[in-house]
């Protein structure tokens, strides 16, 4: 899992977390800020989270100043690591650092309810070449 190999905004290296965006448009923005050239080999995967799976939420007002900084600061990685370690939920929503009014879904693969989350078949995704 890529996020555990390198770490991310919400997890330090060695802590597995699956990142998902609430919409395809947000996923596109999140990918575009990571790459200097348009990626060619991406797919979109819809995720179904059953109603019985607890989803915790962290709002922008819950976060410390500078949480959006790039590169990411260790404080957000600590928050994510604590969430994984405590194991209260399989899913945590957090604001996107690009568009804080939109949500990123963090999935904890080590949580017992993770197996209830369904990943639907992926579809190829082509970035519009006008996005540069």
Predicted regions located by residue number:
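Active-site and NAD+-binding cores of ADP-ribose-processing enzymes
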Residues: 12, 38-132
């Amino acid at each position: 899992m890529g996020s555990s190999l390198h770490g991310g905004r919400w997890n330090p290296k060695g802590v597995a977390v699956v990142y998902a965006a609430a919409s395809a448009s947000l996923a596109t923005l999140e990918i575009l800020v990571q790459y200097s050239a348009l990626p060619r080999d991406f797919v979109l995967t819809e995720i179904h989270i059953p109603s019985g799976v607890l989803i915790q939420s962290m709002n922008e007002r819950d976060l410390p100043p500078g949480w959006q900084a790039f590169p990411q600061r260790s404080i957000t990685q600590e928050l994510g690591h604590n969430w994984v370690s405590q194991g209260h939920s399989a899913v945590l929503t957090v604001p996107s650092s690009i568009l804080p009014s939109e949500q990123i879904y963090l999935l904890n693969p080590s949580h017992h309810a993770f197996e209830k989350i369904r990943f639907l078949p992926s579809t190829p995704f082509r970035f519009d070449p006008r996005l540069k």
